[in-house]
């Protein structure tokens, strides 16, 4: 058996975890002149591959009560900008193919932040409220849900003008767009229906009855099937998009309140705030594959691009867990704060940015091994975080 590498350095601190990065300065030409102890140190350093430091990706953190978005340089990590936005911001979404972040506020407005300027360039007025916001695949068009009145507002993202709207029914819950960009789907908890709307004609294509109190939605990559969490029942429903018909009702055992679809579309993860487990559904055959334990109140998930790993935040116990999807195992669990409610994986997959609504902070977490690097205070009630593939000092997309 190969002996373990010796531990070279140790560091403990009563406050937030710290990361110190450095490099050896001895030229290899002087290797023969080093004493035996120096050779042991170099050998151990070679054995221990140092993990890479964070790159200067920018995390955009949405502070609901501070009415701001904080831009954090993860290489610091340090705050590089505090950006005032419309009141009661809830969500940040990157516009596809552009260096813009759209911030949706419950006050009925959308603030458009430009990078690298890190300023609000435009504010779009949607109505009394602004709910879910989705983009066309090319990022040229956006569709905003105004839940209270039940309207879908069509936007041209280049001119920032409204190009139309569709009125459905008041108090809609959620909205999704098919990956091909052709169909919008909205869930109506009042009538237990889904609405299907054409993005080209701006007309209602049809509806379908699902389970009780439909909520969050997830759409397969081929735009064929939509899954909806029936939050008033202990089940989810699957509907065919082209025919607007029900394919299956899948019993869960508890009321679902969240859905997360793997990037490859093969499996759907169903979460419930009533328990401490998640249900894995075969998205192609509509059957339950497995139930895995989680912490209390799973609220946010992030996948690796190859669909091999999932990172899950559980708000009621302050943990982030790493799940090996391939082997169906909990790889590790880490306490990151009081109430983590959102998380984002950096494009290089080495780090997680985790927003904690209770402590008003952003935790920077290394993914391998799962470990806390530091915590940055960001504002009052951070509720969302995204990390686009942009770096400070980088030119072009």
Tell me what each language-model feature is:
Residues 43-397:
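Predominantly soluble domains enriched in secretory-pathway, periplasmic, or organellar proteins
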Residues 3-35:
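Bacterial N-terminal signal peptides that target proteins for export
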Residues 1-3, 164:
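Accessible peptide chain termini
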């Amino acid at each position: 058996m190969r002996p373990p590498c010796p531990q070279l350095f140790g560091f403990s601190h009563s406050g937030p975890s710290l990361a110190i990065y450095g490099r050896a300065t001895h030229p290899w030409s002087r290797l023969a002149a080093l004493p035996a102890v120096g050779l042991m140190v170099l050998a151990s350093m070679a054995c221990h591959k140092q993990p890479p430091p964070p790159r200067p990706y920018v995390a955009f953190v949405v502070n609901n009560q501070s009415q701001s978005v904080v831009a954090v340089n993860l290489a610091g990590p340090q705050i590089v900008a505090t950006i005032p936005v419309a009141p009661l911001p809830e969500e940040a979404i990157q516009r596809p193919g552009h260096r813009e972040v759209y911030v949706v506020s419950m006050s009925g407005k959308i603030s458009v932040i430009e990078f690298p300027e890190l300023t609000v360039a435009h504010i779009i007025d949607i109505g009394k409220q602004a709910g879910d916001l989705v983009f066309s695949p090319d990022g040229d068009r956006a569709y905003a849900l105004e839940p209270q009145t039940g309207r879908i507002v069509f936007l041209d993202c280049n001119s920032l003008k409204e190009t139309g709207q569709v009125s459905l029914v008041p108090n809609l819950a959620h909205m999704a767009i098919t990956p091909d960009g052709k169909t919008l789907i909205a869930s109506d908890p009042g009538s237990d229906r889904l609405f299907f709307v054409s993005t080209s004609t701006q007309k209602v294509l049809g509806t379908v009855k699902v389970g009780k109190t439909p909520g969050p939605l997830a759409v397969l990559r081929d735009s064929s099937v939509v899954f909806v969490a029936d939050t008033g029942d202990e089940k989810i429903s699957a509907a065919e998009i082209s025919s607007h018909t029900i394919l299956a009702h899948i019993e869960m055992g508890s009321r679902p309140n969240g859905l997360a679809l793997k990037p490859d579309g093969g499996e759907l993860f169903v979460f419930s705030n009533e328990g401490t487990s998640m249900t894995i559904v075969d998205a192609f055959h509509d059957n339950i594959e497995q139930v895995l334990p989680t912490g209390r109140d799973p609220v946010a998930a992030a996948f690796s691009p190859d669909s091999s790993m999932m990172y899950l935040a559980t708000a009621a116990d302050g943990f982030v867990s790493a799940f090996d999807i391939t082997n169906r195992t909990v790889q590790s669990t880490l306490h990151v704060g009081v109430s983590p409610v959102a998380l984002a994986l950096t494009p290089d997959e080495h780090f997680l940015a985790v927003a904690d609504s209770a402590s008003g902070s952003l935790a920077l977490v290394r993914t391998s091994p799962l470990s806390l690097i530091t915590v940055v205070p960001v504002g009052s009630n951070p509720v969302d975080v995204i990390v686009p593939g942009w770096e400070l000092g980088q030119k072009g997309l």
